[in-house]
């Protein structure tokens, strides 16, 4: 099993799809990586040599934010929005939808369970 940047890639999958198991790498970027390194898309993970695995890992490390670094960057971006106090930051702080969705009837996932306001 090939291990790249702390993630074990599935053995039997094609390399272009196996790379998408890493957080931060989609199908398009995995194809870009394989083109840059010069590996065929049709190769399976168990067919890769150690040199090919190391070249893929080197390319990912040079060009992409993946796994923990990506998560940390996203959290820092959200925190900076909250510190600025702009509209998106306030919505994040209150736990409401950020991208313009209506909250009169829906947004239960984001708002949590219903709270009854008054009773007779």
UniProtKB/Swiss-Prot annotation:
GO cellular component terms attached to this protein's record: cytosol; small ribosomal subunit
Pfam family, one: Ribosomal_S13
Quaternary structure and interacting proteins, as annotated: Part of the 30S ribosomal subunit. Forms a loose heterodimer with protein S19. Forms two bridges to the 50S subunit in the 70S ribosome.
Protein name, UniProt field: Small ribosomal subunit protein uS13
Compositional bias ranges of the Basic residues kind: 107-120
Protein's gene: rpsM
Organism domain of life: Bacteria
Keyword Ribonucleoprotein carried by entry: yes
């Amino acid at each position: 099993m090939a291990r790249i940047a702390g993630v074990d890639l599935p053995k039997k999958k094609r390399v272009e799809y196996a790379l998408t198991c890493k957080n931060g790498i989609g199908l398009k970027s995995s194809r870009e990586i394989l083109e840059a390194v010069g590996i065929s898309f049709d190769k399976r993970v168990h067919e890769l040599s150690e040199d090919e695995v190391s070249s893929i890992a080197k390319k990912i490390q040079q060009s992409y934010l993946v796994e923990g670094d990506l998560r940390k960057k996203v959290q820092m971006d959200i925190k900076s929005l909250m510190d600025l106090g702009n509209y998106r930051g306030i919505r994040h702080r209150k736990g409401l939808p950020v991208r313009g969705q209506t909250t009169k009837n829906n947004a239960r996932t984001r708002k949590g369970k219903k709270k009854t306001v008054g009773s007779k």
